[in-house]
């Protein structure tokens, strides 16, 4: 492709909307253009990157025995209602775009395809003899993100590869899950990315087990915790650790103490010389469940620990037997709306009486009590006395009505000891999620009553797996991991072009003819090459070449009269001055080993 004919509009200044390097460089390099909030157009260079990534994904998925298909983007509401996910995905802060057709039928724009593919499987896969089946697609997805940001990292429209496998038993599902794990590792390696597999929460997709693949980058939205012995890695949402030991609180029987206006852990510790680990922190949340119930939560943690809201949501789901649609802290205005004025915020204890909810207008009249294991293990503690300006000192769980059931609700943190090896400790890194695989079990097949006939002639529900890769996000993650102060440094396998021939001065006939000759020789050798034949200044061309990040550059300049060119490797900026025939041989040796 001749650059003079390429739709290439580069920017010298950093667009104000772009916060992270990869977003800035894709905009400046003419790869993408913003159309609206979270909506981007893929320009020719970017589309070639997307196609190269997709080709690698297809190759590995086909090798793993998966079959490509294409499912509809418009989903009838009935399918999602059958699975029980329609309300959660469309109400309140749900992420599904939804609409009505002219007959008043509700439809959704697919953020994911479990419902559609499970429905099809129930119709088409009748016998165990047809199993296992693994179907995948590469398609545009839609999610109504509350706050689109970082370009393609968190958009409202994006390209994704999603796959769904169907099995006769759990063992077969686990085999395919492991095969897909290996396929994903090969995909990311071939794309030139350092991706870390980590234990992950299954989130709204659900299922028994899941694993994310994280590209490590300072701009990553996710915090991942890894053991320094290299044997454990998890998203912080899922991570476990051994917390530091609490400092014992020595004392006699429980006593009331006056703590006027001392409503925070920090203030209490400064005023009385306590350590945070000697206090109980009580939080109030409200959870909205999929059966319409608004459930108040009373959460107790050791004072030096932080709440992991994902773990809380999962615990509430298990305890209530319902899907949690929304979970957030209770604010003073929430209490006012409910007509509740008897809760002394800042002085609450783990034993706050349910009677304070008596006047609640829409909430249930009883707390769901959730106590973290660090709090449940405390012998004596400082906690709120459930009346203004009062705390209890040397309280025990017996004083508070008995030991609570222990849950894991705390955030694991860097520096803490690992559960699997007390000698190992957690370190933290930022990560960009580019892939996620799930063992769904029978969650969707049971909800949608999709069955097959087993060897015994009886019908049973499918075992299912789900496997996703964010293709467009992966492309930007590659830029985040591979760039320098001059621009993008694409890994060779996913670069839009393998090489670019840059003629410093197209007005010089010798340079122009040699550049043309080298370009045609590269094309004849099967190299996907660019030829910068623009009548621009050499400095402009070199800056553009650095910015767009083509892995190899052949510079035809003032030494062209001697038949000498420069061969430049973009990743390390190494320059070789070679006779043009030798430069061509060296480039072909590298690109076609």
From Swiss-Prot:
Keywords: Aminoacyl-tRNA synthetase, ATP-binding, Cytoplasm, Ligase, Nucleotide-binding, Protein biosynthesis. It is found in: Cytoplasm. Signal peptide: none annotated. GO terms for biological process: prolyl-tRNA aminoacylation. InterPro entries: aa-tRNA-synt_IIb, aa-tRNA-synth_II, aa-tRNA-synth_II/BPL/LPL, Anticodon-bd, Anticodon-bd_dom_sf, Pro-tRNA-ligase_IIa, Pro-tRNA-synth_IIa_bac-type, Pro-tRNA-Synthase_IIa_type1. It is an enzyme of class 6 (ligase). It catalyses: tRNA(Pro) + L-proline + ATP = L-prolyl-tRNA(Pro) + AMP + diphosphate. Its EC number is 6.1.1.15. One of its GO terms (molecular function) is proline-tRNA ligase activity. GO terms for cellular component: cytosol. Catalyzes the attachment of proline to tRNA(Pro) in a two-step reaction: proline is first activated by ATP to form Pro-AMP and then transferred to the acceptor end of tRNA(Pro). As ProRS can inadvertently accommodate and process non-cognate amino acids such as alanine and cysteine, to avoid such errors it has two additional distinct editing activities against alanine. One activity is designated as 'pretransfer' editing and involves the tRNA(Pro)-independent hydrolysis of activated Ala-AMP. Belongs to the class-II aminoacyl-tRNA synthetase family. ProS type 1 subfamily. Homodimer. Consists of three domains: the N-terminal catalytic domain, the editing domain and the C-terminal anticodon-binding domain. This is Proline--tRNA ligase. The gene is proS.
